[in-house]
């Protein structure tokens, strides 16, 4: 197999001695062979015993398990990542279910809040507004020559925690860790970026340890021009890169995506990735209930960019299954803090307007006041699906859930808000209120629920099921853009991997232990869709599978030879 041959071949490097040991992408620590220690000037710089990566992993895992607090575990793993990336990924891949919540949600939220306190070593690129005229220079300072995936944030809407300034860098770092651990994209090809445009978080501005630009956030044309300067510089440095926008505030997220999605290969994971994984989960849940997505009625709590992005993707899938645009939109109801979105509601955002309900269609509804509440909407719309993206805990009350089940025996309930402290309802409560009949998926990880002598596995509707496969597919086929069809293909491929939909039992989504298979399946579907949309060169299925193999990186040590030898 080509992959095996690749790892058997030596890599010629110009580094040696302490310089080599300080390079996390190349460092092997105690695993350097006798020959490598001689030719790379490492004798005396590492302990005498030569270890395998498995022996090293046993040691670091033992150290990891001694730590009690999740944030301490996060800091430990980040330090390992900055020291020896191959060992880090070997450890994470072999303990993915245990460690994903530590390196990403929910613990990454706490790491972002305390970023300046726990900061130890530089990773990624910090592009601050005062240096707006030096962006090309800063990109040239990146030592990685073949960057293929960038995740960028401005730190304004970090999970459900709001403005974290440059602390938002924790999100691109964590996200790219999952591109590698779940999608096999080499860490040598990834770059996390934070656009430091100031912060409106007064606690950070007052914090003497805060490491970002201590000014209120720039806005308007200043902000737009700065983002554009970054994107244009990226296009000059790495014109074929996949650029993922992450955790931008809703007032900026949709406009940025709309502006650049046809200019550079890019997508917004909060809008499109969240939508794709949610739709995949909903297709599977609909199949498990004996129907299709086009048959469902959907109520959202939360009408921001993420919620509206999911809604639009649901509508696209309903249309794909045969409904007209009008029919599909009549089946989706958006509720925000001011109530149900209607055509009479003032001050709607641009992306909300297509999702309003016409007032005349609500004439027969029985409501408690002028603002149509979530409970009013559930009572009158009679949804089969309830989705929470509000970041407001506890709003899926017992009354709401029981009202929903009164007209739908097996309601599909998805409290997707992150982190766990922001979830609209816990799976245990939802299952208790529905006597175990609800199908539940969450945004943050939850343990299985034990009730009535049964165990209910809880699917985590996590974007990590989608974006690594999208990235792998884009890299494998060389896609020039990320199209809507590619995202729909990802959703459909994910649904095909659902144990519950396929076998009638288990969780809505496969276990994380199956993530490589899932990512490869999604990558193939995404690449085929890219070819159909003519944004990638058409090749045979066999060649495409070979390209996916070629692009899939495993955390294995390579043997080194000095470039001068």
Swiss-Prot record:
Its keywords, alphabetically, are:
Metal-binding, NAD, Oxidoreductase
Q: Which CDD domains match?
A: NAD_bind_1_malic_enz
Cofactor(s) demanded: Mg(2+); Mn(2+)
From the UniProt record, which GO molecular function terms apply?
malate dehydrogenase (decarboxylating) (NAD+) activity; metal ion binding; NAD binding; oxaloacetate decarboxylase activity
Q: Name one GO cellular component term.
A: cytosol
Top EC category: oxidoreductase
Q: Which residues does the annotation say bind NAD(+)? A: 157, 270, 418
Does the record's keyword annotation contain Endoplasmic reticulum? Answer: no
SMART domains in the cross-refs: malic, Malic_M
User: Which GO biological process annotations does it have?
Assistant: malate metabolic process
Record's Pfam families? malic, Malic_M
* Reactions catalysed, as given in the entry: (S)-malate + NAD(+) = pyruvate + CO2 + NADH; oxaloacetate + H(+) = pyruvate + CO2
State the source organism's domain of life. Bacteria
**What Gene3D superfamilies would the database entry show?**
Malic enzyme, N-terminal domain, NAD(P)-binding Rossmann-like Domain
Catalytic site residues? 104 (proton donor), 175 (proton acceptor)
Site positions (Important for activity) are 270
List its EC numbers: 1.1.1.38
Q: How does it assemble?
A: Homotetramer.
Q: According to its UniProt record, which protein family does this protein belong to?
A: Belongs to the malic enzymes family.
The protein depicted here goes by the name NAD-dependent malic enzyme
Q: Which gene encodes it?
A: maeA
